[in-house]
Structure formats: C-alpha cells, structure tokens
Amino acid sequence: MEVIVPFSTERPKSRLSAVLTPDERAAFARTMLQDVLAAIDAADGEPRILATGAVGIDLPSPVEIDDRPLTDAVNAAIDARLGNDGAERVAVVMADLALATPNALRELFAAGREAEVAIAPGRGGGTNAFVAGHPAFRVDYHGASYLDHRRIADEIGAGVRVVDSHRLATDVDEPADLAELLIHAEADGDGGRAARWLRDAGFALDTTDGRVGVRRE
C-alpha cells in the first residue's frame, strides 16, 4: 500500500520552541520522519514523502514537493492516486508519529483494506493517519479534523473503521509529548532515532514533582 507522509520544512515543530532552538526543531523533526518511514517500511507499506520543500537529508523514500497548505496538498495527492480508477487504497500517515510501530500500522492498513475509510484519530480531535479507498474522500485538516473526516465519509456514503491506537494517537507537538516518547523508548529498551536524539541532546525523564515530565541536563 502506498503511504503518503506529509512533512513541513517551514518552521517545523514551532510549539517546541520553549525547549528547542529552530535548528534543533528541524533536526528533531527529521529524526521523527525517519522513524515513521522505517515503521511504514517494516509494515510492508510504500512510503512517499510529501514535503513543502527540500528535506535536507538523504532518505530511502521518494520525495514529492508541494508547498501548498496541508489540506490542499494531501487532497491533490489523494486525487492523483484514487481518481480515474487509480490505486485501490492509499494511506496518509503524519511525520511526527514517533511512537508508531509496524504492528500499529499493520492494524491501520488491515482496517483500510476492509473499509472504504479507516481513521486513526489523534489526541485532541485531530487525524493522525488514515487509509482511503473511496475515490470521493477528501481531507480537511482544520480544527477537529477527526469529526470532519467522519462527516465527509458519511456524506459520500463511505463505510468507516476507527483504529483506536495509542501509538498512532500520539503525535509529538508539545514539550509534554517528549516525555511520552522517552517513556516508551525506555519501556521498549531503546526506542528509535527520535528518542536517541532527545537523549543525546540531554533530555531525560523527570518525576520530581510527582508527574512525569522532561528535563534537559
């Protein structure tokens, strides 16, 4: 299954500006992208990067440049693949799902083969990943996009499967999300490139106030 991975090269991860410099945010975003690509590949997906500009590192997957807003770029990519009797299914997986595992993605892909639309909602009402097989399905990433995508699927008469996955629901956007990444990396024995990048940058789990957070040494 072809898997589109949108990636923004313009001011990436701006909500991490309290803990990372602009250069660090760009580097961290690229490591998360690499983790997502590796997980997709291990799940027998075929990742294709949809970037707003040059990514800046060598990657094993093809890169398509589209500097339009996310909704427009993803809709164009879907239309190019599902329109005119094209591919039977196409997936979209966000590049900041650093907790994504091959097993979680296999579950998403399997759901997408059984339903016309399979959605993995994110925390806070977003849409972190989906598989579309209905040629009329389109995205709208503004606001509570999970609800919007359920509505869009209903309007076109597409059957929907919801994939309830902590691994796919957790996108790394804010400082509190860094703790989630380090927790699972420790539980898994190492973690991926993004977790190693954080540790190399001096980040560690902090439980001094009774809640789990991160500190930078």
From Swiss-Prot:
Q: Which Pfam families match?
A: CofC (PF01983)
Which EC number(s) does UniProt give? 2.7.7.68
Its domain of life? Answer: Archaea
Q: Which reaction does it catalyse?
A: (2S)-2-phospholactate + GTP + H(+) = (2S)-lactyl-2-diphospho-5'-guanosine + diphosphate
The record's annotation in SUPFAM superfamilies points to:
Nucleotide-diphospho-sugar transferases
Which pathway does the protein contribute to? Cofactor biosynthesis; coenzyme F420 biosynthesis
Q: What keywords were assigned to this record? A: GTP-binding, Nucleotide-binding, Nucleotidyltransferase, Transferase
NCBIfam families for this protein: F420_cofC
Supply the name of the protein.
2-phospho-L-lactate guanylyltransferase
Native source organism of the sequence: Halorubrum lacusprofundi (strain ATCC 49239 / DSM 5036 / JCM 8891 / ACAM 34)
